Amino acid sequence: CGVSRSSATAEDLPQASFAGQQETFLNVSGERALIDACRRCFASLFTDRAISYRETQGFDHMEVALSIGVQHMVRSDLAGSGVMFSIDTETGFPDVAVISAAWGLGETVVQGAVDPDKYLIFKPLLEEERYAPIIECTLGAKERKMIYATGGSTRTATVETTQKERELFVLDEAEILELARWAVTIERHYGKPMDMEWAKDGETGK
């Protein structure tokens, strides 16, 4: 199965993020389902929400283009996923990476529908083996998770997490540091602070 992911020209801009304005479809299987998902991605340029946002931000509706990325979908529904920033978005402090993590597919974290775990990492110490660069680990409630749906027309389902899942951190120390190093690498490549999404494959452990 795969994911049909929208990517518009007016996204993640300094003055307007356009976060969540276009649609992404998860757990898509088969050619017909993929074509349908792509059509719906294109059509999401003209939802009430997207039109209203462009009007508010002063963007010409006819000047916004959209492409679609079709990706292999890893089984993060069997593990965890989330988002990370190469800067502290609340304070603007540039020397930390901030990682959010929850069980299941990352859509719950992106949409703000779940209280995720949060990790704060001091970037300058990532290459210093003598020091521990993890500043803080905060356990989130993680009361629900999004998983693959079985049968029917719905591709995903949101279910309650177990008590054990709520009490455990999604990431261990090695995984936190690996993600933080990727955040630094990506930030260096683009030459500016970046926000990223990540997912762990529950079948391969990667």
Positions of predicted regions on the chain:
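Conserved mixed alpha/beta core segments that line enzyme active sites in large multi-domain catalysts
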Residues: 1-206
